[in-house]
A protein has these predicted regions:
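Juxtamembrane helix-loop junctions of ABC transporter transmembrane domains
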Residues: 11-18, 41-42, 49-65, 69, ...
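Transmembrane helix-loop-helix hairpins at lipid-water interfaces of multipass membrane proteins
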Residues: 36-99, 179-184, 295-299
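An intracellular "coupling" helix at the cytosolic face of ABC transporter transmembrane type-1 domains
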Residues: 34, 131-132, 150-157, 161, ...
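Conserved catalytic Walker-motif region of ABC-type ATPase nucleotide-binding domains
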Residues: 126, 248, 336, 364-366
Length: 600
């Protein structure tokens, strides 16, 4: 997909983008306020309780050291105080561990709620997107966003953001404790902090584009894989296995290289920051020892300070180690929100009305359209279909036949001219009522995972079983269905895998028959069935199309010889029109197409 991070995806601008992404991610957490509040409370409680440990240990060490310095047996009287501090530490650590466990359970539930809502938002917007969106982007790439990218964001929300929250608590409390113990040592300790901040920001700015590239390469690989899986029979038939494997290797290599570059650069931060923090600890140890020898700090306080300095540095190291994960999550979030924010199909205007009591008169007047407005595929197209007429549209590939269907259904709006149904401009009626006025059978059949009954009843969920069976009989598929062990309750999987293409085509025809709309579109409706099945379908169609306005688009001219009107298209224009006999008598382009198919 083009510019994945932008569509499905300046220092200041990057910071603003990160801020906006974090705000939107936080809103997803905020939709589950109780779980979020519990997570924050447990995180704070667990960390704060654990952070009292070094202070209590330092007090115990001070008491023991004071007793030994006195060189008197009475020094042992401080043992109750030491045991008190040890017991308090044990209780605090136990409570902290219990809270940490509870926190992990809360985060599992919160994570589940967030990923469910995010996937729903993505899918909800997908249902509102115009057909043009799916014409531009690969299905596998979109699936990559819904699965991989949402999971990546979710993992970051449930783990990385929680880690950041714990880091803030730990760093703040540790710094407060260090200031209360030895302010002078804090100054020494903070010498290396600017270097840590500068280095982290530098690496972050460098790796984020790499993670964007990684997500893009993975989406491209998924799209290619899905495309090849769908076309594996064609690949084998044409002996292109080696070529496909080579193409896959190229895309796979690109994805692996992008992954390696992103991870290699992302993992630099952790070791580097850890090294800087170790230098800081070395400085604290040296100056702390000098301060102790001069009597400026007690042994227990120095021990506490060193432990707090480690606790201060530890979370920073952990955050540095997840910089790569965070950048990956930001790149994934850009793609997820890019899909959520993709421009939906324009809403019907406030004046739009329902298309009711459709008679089936369709008129196209001077229609011009191009997927790229600068390159029209339909030019100044005119058509008048009377109610109940059978209109056939024929022509070579790329002539604009299927585009006509998309315009009739208002999947796209014409750039010039107008389309009317029963004298009403289709822009003035609701899209839903317009599309329900048509039944459609496409060349590429679509069956969902469900029973045969549910597939035929799709679009008319309230249909009775008798109506479904009647439609199946009319489509000449009833006998095949009844021969199956489960009959109409047979469950189809993977777009009808296990039944023939012709049978899948017949099921979609039965679906269109059941819908019984006043207008019918057949796009290559019988191109995927054998001659005998085609004859059966044609016989059923002639009876069921009576009284309906029908548009048939086919390369096989045998299917449309009885059409009331035939439009012959070439390069986006109607070059001939009339019935079969008239067009054959003209001995023009249609006659050439016909003879090319049937002569000899």
């Amino acid at each position: 997909m083009e510019n994945r991070s932008g569509v499905l995806g300046a220092d200041r601008q990057n910071r603003q983008k990160r801020g906006a992404l974090l705000l939107r991610l936080w809103r997803y957490l905020g939709r589950n306020r109780l779980l979020l509040a519990a997570a924050v409370g447990l995180s704070l409680g667990s960390n704060i309780l654990a952070l009292f440990g070094p202070r209590l240990a330092g007090q115990a060490i001070n008491a023991i050291a004071a007793g030994y310095r006195s060189k008197k047996p009475t020094g042992r009287r401080d043992l109750p105080f030491v045991w008190n501090r040890a017991a308090t530490m044990a209780v605090f650590y136990l409570l902290s561990a219990c809270m940490s466990y509870t926190l992990s359970q809360v985060m599992i539930r919160l994570s589940r709620q967030v990923v469910r809502q995010m996937r729903r938002d993505v899918f909800e917007n997908l249902a509102r997107l115009p057909v043009g969106f799916f014409d531009r982007y690969q299905t596998g790439d979109i699936l990559s966003v819904i699965t991989y990218d949402v999971d990546t964001v979710n993992q970051s929300l449930s783990a990385d953001l929680l880690q950041i929250l714990q880091t803030v608590v730990t760093v703040t409390v540790s710094l407060g404790m260090m200031l209360s113990i030895a302010p002078k040592l804090v100054l020494i300790f903070c010498v290396t902090i600017p270097a840590t901040i500068f280095f982290t920001r530098y690496i972050t700015a460098r790796v984020r584009p790499l993670f964007r590239r990684r997500s893009a390469a993975l989406g491209e690989l998924n799209g290619f894989t899905e495309e090849m899986m769908n076309g594996q029979k064609t690949t084998k038939a044409y002996g292109q296995e080696a070529a496909v494997l080579e193409a896959f290797d190229q895309k796979n290599r690109k994805a692996v290289d992008a992954y390696t570059q992103a991870e290699a650069n992302g993992t630099i931060v952790g070791p580097a920051v850890n090294c800087i923090n170790n230098l800081s600890l070395a400085l604290v140890s040296v100056f702390g020892a000098l301060l102790y020898l001069s009597g400026g700090i007690q042994l227990g306080d120095l021990s506490s300070f060193v432990q707090y300095s480690r606790k201060f540095s530890g979370p920073i190291n952990e955050v540095a180690n997840i910089v790569g994960e965070l950048q990956s999550a930001f790149a994934a979030a850009e793609r997820v929100f890019g899909l959520i924010d993709a421009e939906p199909e324009p809403a019907d205007g406030p004046e739009a009305r329902e298309l009711a009591q459709v008679q089936g008169e369709v008129a196209l007047d001077g229609v011009t359209f191009g997927y790229d407005p600068a390159k029209p595929v339909i030019r100044d197209f005119d058509l008048l279909a009377r109610p109940g007429a059978l209109v056939a549209i024929v022509g070579p590939t790329g002539a604009g036949k299927t585009t006509i269907v998309k315009l009739l259904m208002r999947f796209y709006d014409a750039q010039a001219g107008r389309i009317q149904v029963d004298g009403q401009e289709i822009r003035t009626v609701t899209r839903t009522s317009l599309r329900r006025a048509y039944s459609m059978v496409l060349q590429d059949t679509w069956l969902f995972s469900g029973t045969i009954y549910e597939n035929i009843a799709y679009g008319r969920e309230n249909a009775t079983r008798q109506e479904v069976i009647a439609a199946a009989k009319a489509a000449r598929i009833h006998n095949f269905i009844m021969a199956l062990p489960q009959g109409y309750d047979t469950v189809l999987q993977d777009n009808g895998a296990g039944i023939s293409k012709g049978q899948r085509q017949l099921l979609t025809i039965a679906r269109a028959m059941l819908l019984d709309s006043p207008m019918l579109i057949l796009d290559e409706a019988t191109s995927n069935v054998d001659t005998r099945t085609e004859q059966e379908i044609q016989a059923a169609m002639e009876a069921l199309m009576a009284g309906k306005t029908c548009f048939v688009i086919a390369h096989r001219l045998s299917t449309i010889r009885h059409a009331d009107h035939i439009l012959v298209m070439r390069e986006g224009r109607v070059v001939e029109q009339g019935n079969h006999e008239t067009l054959m008598a003209q001995k023009g382009f249609y006659a050439k197409l016909y003879y090319a198919q049937f002569a000899g």
